[in-house]
Amino acid sequence: AGVPVVVISSYPAGDADSISRSLVIGPDDNRSTDAASKREDRAWLFELETELAAEYDEVSVFDPYEVLCDQSVCRIAVDGTEYYTDTNHLSKAGSLLLAPAMAEILGVEIR
């Protein structure tokens, strides 16, 4: 038995136009992007990660899509709260949204 390893899969990239617009004119209440296209963009990588986890008992995969997306959309902002600082970085609110699910897979308690 080895050391437990958690692979943190990529999260859906934010929409550049939407994020830029919110910086110029202020945040919109709710913004999202198409979940199917975002999942397709990273399908090859997620398949590789899940195959790795299936091959090794000590490896598990944390999938941010399970928190940030539903079947149709990936949320960029909800009720005026921005989940991204730019297309590639989560905001503090976005990170805090992922925290409970990450804590669960890591087996730690959030204080």
Residue ranges and their predicted role:
Residues 1-111:
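Extracellular glycan-modifying ectodomains
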